[in-house]
Amino acid sequence: MASIMGAVAAVKNNAASILDDHTIEQACYKTGYRFRRRILTPIVVIRLFILQVLHDHTACQAVTHLTDLSFSAQAYIQARMRIPLKVFQCVCRTMVQGLLQSTQDKSDAARWFGHRLLRVDGTGVSMPDVPQLNRRFGQPDGVKPGCGFPVAHLLVLVHAGTGLIMDIIASPYRTHDARQLTKLLNHVLPDDVLLGDRAFCSYSYLSLLLQRQAQVVVRAHQRLIVNFKCGRKSYRQLPKKQRVGAPRGRYIKSLGYDDQLVSYLRIDSTCPDWMPLAQWQQLPSELTVRELRYRIRRRGYRTRS
């Protein structure tokens, strides 16, 4: 796996070659944005904005010293505000794809045992208190009217080998991570390994990702009962009086200590509300899943399993 410092250095070295004038003009054309020829064209503004991001703690006033052009910080801010968000999104996606290809073509250092490793996780960001953002994203519970700030929920897909953010989905604050993952599945390719937390441990997502011939590594959901006893019976194999606390996964075989293969069955009554019942019924009726338990021991930290 490539280090973070090496990945950042590769991004800075390759960004200029990938982000040429034609790429930015194509992004403006695809999104329908028309502009006049002036000092701060979208080509100049977007390049300066990326330089501002890559250089830590660079204020807008310092951007004026990164080029030979003569303009003020206020003019740069206004020019950046004129560019639609769709143009930035199109340029970012083009840059990410180009940087991923440039790093993967040179060596296999960005892969984990030959697999492309992706990470998915959600977070929240606070935004300015304006009516449009309040209506779109909302505020946390318990905040008095007029006192809080709107908060957006972000679901991020990260390429672990380079640290590049492949895509971001912004949604209202009270949105669960699992509801938005389907919008990121187009980035998952066969033989990829997707790493997520327990929010993505569900039959629906395991099935959708396995249909794309990808591998999934997630933490077991807190409501999922796991039992590593060899030859134990599943929930459906026990009498009704003995089903309390029994695992629903059918035991197949043991692969070692705290390591086993189990079979999950699709149950129509557990269809998620975001998936149509017809699509749910088209998923495989049974999944073979590997369950294992390990402990992370770090000196000075609590042991987790």
Enumerate the predicted regions with their spans.
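Single, function-defining residue in the core of a domain
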Residues: 1-57, 62-63, 70, 76-83, ...
